Amino acid sequence: ILCKAYRKMYPEEAGSDRTEYVYWSRLAATKLGAEYFKYDYFRRFLHHKVNQGYTLKQVFKGMELSDMLAGCIVAINSESDEEDSGNGDRVRKMTAGKTSVTENEKLTSTIAEKIEKYLKKNWMEVLNHYRDQRKAAGEYYGRVLQGHKKVAAADVGWAGSGAVVLQYLIRHEWGLDCEIIGLLAGTNSIHNGMEKDTAEGLRAVGKQASYLYSQEHNRDVWKFHNAAKGHNLLWELLLSSEEGSLRGFYLKRMESGAGGNGIFCEIRLGVFDEKHAGVTVEIQRGILDFMQLWNALTPGDRAEAVEISGRDVYAAVRICCDEANRQEMEKLFDKEGI
């Protein structure tokens, strides 16, 4: 919808050499950037899912590491405690009465730490699961960025990691000479605890820009916005795609009867939900209707109103942050794919 609205507002930018809708998501970024952004990998795939009702089977499926689950369970169940023997040596003692962990065990903080320990011990095997996905994404973005030295990647937010991971892959994994500038709707807020400053350094050096608010811009909005109250999800719903969230990039061999035996990139999206897609279309039809009214303004009127501040935009959506409205809108989300 951002691409559609931008092209309506600036028809001269409508060509594919100027703007293009591209596939990317925090799920894809987390997998593809795991080698360098290990902390983010475990935070998103493990620690954010603690005590949320996810089973170990679901967690490993989400990471696309299902074949490593059995080995991890064996490692967890065979884990033992260490005791001091009294003469300075350490001896291993099996924990008495310990209940065996199964694939249907719910993820807790204790189990998450043990899974992280196991995956770190087998880190190269983890990365090898995403090797072909990194190659496939490189094929895709190699075509998208061909002939470009500097591009802006527009994203909702919030830590700005999407553009950061993409920049790392472009330079260090795929060897492309292109600079990425992240354009965010909003950054992490004061309610993000230790991660509230994530985007600030990048903004300071001009690698990211935030429209709605930041620590130095509309600070009252920065203090109001709270992911724990669903505020992130409201914005993501407004700007989400009707075709489903990106699951990842995959290499696929072309059939011999389809023009050759080459390898090409297959883009996989989340499960298409007609109900959610219909709601998204309705919401975004309103956005496009507004753009049509905007473009109908006379040049003089348009010049007066050309700057719509981030505060004004947030004020309209803030109504949806009311508890009753928020609960109704949350029923529409594909939280797993966002």
Annotated model-derived regions:
Residues C3-D17, Q167-L176:
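Short, surface-exposed basic-aromatic patches at helix termini and helix-loop junctions that form
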Residues K8, E12, Y23-S25, K38-R44:
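Intrinsically disordered, low-complexity regions enriched in small/polar residues
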Residues E12-L32:
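Conserved beta-strand -> loop -> alpha-helix junction used to position metal-binding or nucleic-acid-contacting
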Residues E20, T30-M63, D67-I338:
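Long, contiguous domain-sized segments
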